[in-house]
């Protein structure tokens, strides 16, 4: 022990999959592909949502869905969610007025959705899922997919500043939306901290595997994506 220096221990490698861009409260991750391809594919995509509606009381739009209708990546974890256009996002785009350099701007999601629907004469009080299915404009679907992408964008960073925060699009059991700028001290206070927080939580999974193993020589410390989502969503460590 005299030759070991001041510190000794073990390092474990763990996969970084969905550790920085995950809601640390609900365990929600974005598994959608929001790239525009064709109008018909866009109609099919939005047709898979259970409901698309405007919540008058809350003044936001809601996209209710079951991941099972879109992808198999959520298999074995929670699949039913409701996305809400709550809060602001930082949009990154090329500005022609600045030699097409990348710039950022903060946008209010709900206002942008209202503008898009108004442009195409869509009544937000009506059945939005049906109204979307009736659209034939490629530009409309490009705009809608872009806004959905921004809704799903949890990490928001502003070029040339220290602004770098997390904003979840789904509410927790109490109706609150995780935001790293306003959350309590027990949760990550910025986007980088969220990555470290969730890597540490994967460490808890590894420790649990070691504790439960009957043969440490044959233990498998690999964490599957399914295992990680289940752990992040169920948070079993809170009951210990």
Regions found by a protein language model. Give the residues of each.
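Positively charged, helix-rich recognition surfaces that bind polyanionic ligands
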Residues: 1-240
């Amino acid at each position: 022990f005299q030759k070991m220096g001041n510190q000794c221990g073990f390092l474990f490698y763990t996969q970084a999959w969905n550790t920085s861009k995950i809601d640390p409260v609900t365990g929600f991750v974005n598994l959608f592909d929001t790239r525009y391809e064709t109008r018909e594919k866009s109609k099919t995509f939005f047709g898979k949502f259970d409901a698309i509606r405007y919540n008058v009381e809350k003044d936001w739009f809601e996209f209710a869905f079951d991941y099972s209708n879109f992808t198999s990546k959520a298999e074995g974890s929670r699949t039913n969610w409701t996305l809400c256009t709550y809060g602001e996002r930082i949009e990154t785009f090329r500005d022609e007025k600045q030699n097409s350099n990348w710039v950022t701007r903060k946008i209010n999601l709900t206002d942008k959705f209202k503008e898009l629907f108004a442009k195409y004469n869509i009544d937000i009080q009506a059945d939005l899922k049906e109204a979307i299915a009736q659209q034939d404009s490629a530009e409309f679907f490009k705009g809608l997919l872009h806004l959905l992408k921004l809704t799903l964008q949890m990490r928001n960073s502003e070029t040339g500043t220290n602004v770098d925060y997390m904003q979840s699009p789904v509410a927790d059991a109490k109706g609150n939306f995780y935001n790293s700028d306003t959350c309590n001290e027990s949760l990550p206070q910025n986007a980088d901290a969220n990555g470290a927080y969730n890597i540490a939580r994967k460490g808890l999974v590894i420790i649990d595997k070691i504790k439960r193993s009957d043969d440490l020589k044959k233990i498998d410390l690999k964490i599957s994506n399914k295992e990680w989502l289940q752990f992040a969503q169920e948070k079993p460590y809170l009951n210990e």
